[in-house]
A protein has these predicted regions:
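Basic, Lys/Arg- and aromatic-enriched nucleic-acid-binding interface segment
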Residues: 68, 87, 93-142, 146
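Major-groove DNA-contacting interfaces characterized by cationic-aromatic clusters
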Residues: 177-208
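Conserved tyrosine-mediated DNA breakage-rejoining catalytic core shared by Y-recombinases
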Residues: 146-181
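N-terminal DNA-binding recognition helix of tyrosine site-specific recombinases/integrases
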Residues: 32, 40-45, 59-92, 138-140, ...
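Short, leucine-enriched amphipathic alpha-helices that occur as contiguous helical runs
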Residues: 26, 112, 126-128, 202, ...
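Basic/aromatic-enriched alpha-helical hairpins
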Residues: 2-60
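Short, basic (Lys/Arg/His-rich) helix/loop patches that form interaction surfaces
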Residues: 122, 206-225
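Short, contiguous acidic/charged loop-to-helix segments that flank catalytic cores in large enzymes
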Residues: 120-121, 157-167, 192-201, 220-225
Length: 225
């Protein structure tokens, strides 16, 4: 396919995805590739390209696991293209995607209390508050939380993007206080009004919370989409 860029094919790949949450993850990868090398093709994305992309992500302040997610998305597109006989090239045979181990335990009640009451720096307050909101809303997934429409009353009803399962949550006073503090224009919270992509916000959230004393943010309030 002469003249067809990797981004051109990625756009078609994204269109075939049914779930909005999945689409958004690949849209994020598309943005990174567009910033790094918008004219990349299946032919030019080789071992050396992957290494340069990985280093560029690192220099841009992205974490190991966040970078790994983007690389796995690129790999998924290659696998799909190979299955559909679009290309026979596969640069991942000799490229190992790095992964940073995370603590497998959950935060204890004492950890959460310490995090809630911790005297954080000004820039960390929002990240701490949003994490606590995830906890107050029974571990709601980030993609679901940030896409909720403006709140009406004191109940949240939503379908989880990953499973399509219906949930109903009562908003307790502690959660309501945070929601009102970061009220959005088009959504319940202002995260997507400001960041446009929830993955960018989550990256900053994890980085900020890891600097709050010895309290570590674990799990992003549920499994990452």
């Amino acid at each position: 396919n002469v003249g067809v860029t990797f981004i051109d094919y990625l756009d078609k790949f994204i269109e075939m995805k049914d779930k909005w949450g999945t689409k958004k993850v690949y849209v994020e990868t598309r943005k990174k590739i567009e910033m790094f090398d918008p004219n990349a093709t299946f032919q030019t994305i080789n071992l050396e390209w992957l290494s340069r992309f990985e280093n560029w992500m690192k220099e841009s302040g992205c974490g190991v696991n966040y970078t790994g997610k983007q690389l796995r998305n690129i790999r998924a597109v290659f696998n799909y293209a190979i299955d559909n006989e679009v290309t026979t090239l596969y640069p991942f045979r000799r490229f190992k995607i790095k992964k940073e181990e995370t603590v497998k335990r959950s935060l204890s009640v004492e950890d959460l209390r310490e995090l809630k009451d911790y005297d954080v720096q000004e820039y960390q307050k929002k990240y701490r508050d949003i994490f606590m909101l995830m906890f107050y809303l029974r571990g709601i997934n980030a993609v679901d939380l940030f896409n909720l429409p403006p709140l009406v009353g004191n109940k949240i009803v939503y379908r989880r993007a990953k499973t399509n399962r219906l949930y109903e949550l009562k908003v307790e006073p502690e959660a309501m206080e945070i929601i009102q503090r970061y009220k959005g224009e088009n959504y319940m919270l202002d995260v997507l009004d400001i960041y446009k992509n929830y993955l960018d916000f989550l990256h900053h959230l994890n980085t900020a919370l890891q600097k709050i004393g010895d309290v570590k943010r674990v799990g992003r309030g549920g499994k990452k989409e």
